[in-house]
Amino acid sequence: MRKLFYWAFAFSLCVLMGCKDDGVRVEVVRYAINEPVFMSISEFRNSVKVTDEVVPITKRGKICFYKDYLYISSPDKGIHIVDNRNPASPRIAGFVELIGNEDLSIKDDKLYADSYVDLVWFDISDPERPELEGRVENAFRYALPTIENGYGFDYNMCYSEEARAKGVVVGWEPKEREETIYHYPSYGDDLMANDAASGTSTQGVNGSMARFSIYGKYLYTVEQNIMCVFDLSGDKPVLTTNDIWLQRGVETLFNYKDKMFMGTPTGMLIYSLEDPLAPKYRSSVSHVFGCDPVVVEDDLAYVTVHSGNTCGQNTNELMLIDVSDVDQPNLLVTYGMKCPKGLGIDNGTLFLCDEGLKVFNTKDPMTLMANQLVHYAGMEGYDVIPFKNTLMMIADDGLYQYDYSNLQGCFTRA
């Protein structure tokens, strides 16, 4: 369940031009594109493995905290299990090998996670020995591996009937291609003959980057602009509705009261969960094209927009939005940032991943910058979970933790 983008031409582009006697201009275009690497369905669905071996945390991912244990996704590879009963000395307790994982959520000793096209779930009543209980096959039809090289991908090679018969896409192989494009004078220079690359329960606490969210007995998942709702009240999750089409591609989910706040590349959406099976659009706040998570406390939403991402813009901001009237949210103030990412809030204290970790007192939203409590640099923070005076932060180089019981004193890294 990851964002993918379609570019007609990738970074590596070479154009050779010529002209025929009839005035048709000919271009030979060379470009780089990702072609899919497949794994058979049987191999894919039999690849889950739980190990107590210590697997180092080498890549940032989504995080979920539950009953003194922290679960950290290693994107596309699996889930780290961290014993956090002593935050001053966390212990890596195991690893779940789960190909294609990115998101996770927990309720009533059940861990729900994506595995490319499938939704899988584990019994974690013994947190250090998760047991695979089942999977909802093909729950996420458009899931593909993360693209890191900046090239586009061949849509037909991934989604055609022939492609689906090959199995599941689990990786990418960059290829160089050459295509001929004809420009006809009567139709203008923008006409192309070919499209080069179109192509009463206990519940875990998620970070702000999550695209899984639990409300009551339901699990909500988003895949681009499609939402699915699963009923978790029985022995296994049951898909309750057909696809719910959202107004925009959604990147993050955050529940507040009976509302769901969604971060998208172009702004924040607010949906009502009064009918949990039929989320209803209420309003939105737009911003420049960018990536953003959102958290809410005391009817105030905090939204970050950052550059250096697949959203393709250079704006870095923290937006504060009054959502006391969800039908008419009001942007109060915008603060410039360096490159903000995940954030969390607990009882008036805002934790923000920007140039490391910044902490603010939010008593007066209009003077937030004057109420910065502390700034820890030297790491690239990605997302946070504040919980009972312990701030858990996943960064590019691993897990950081801070005791924030005394905000006037120093935090302590675990």
Each predicted region: which residue ranges?
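Sec-dependent signal peptide recognition
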Residues: R2-A10
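Hydrophobic alpha-helical targeting segments used for export or membrane insertion
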Residues: F9-L13, A414
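C-terminal motif of bacterial Sec signal peptides marking the signal peptidase cleavage site
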Residues: V15-G18
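Feature marking well-ordered beta-strand scaffolds used for ligand recognition
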Residues: K20-A414
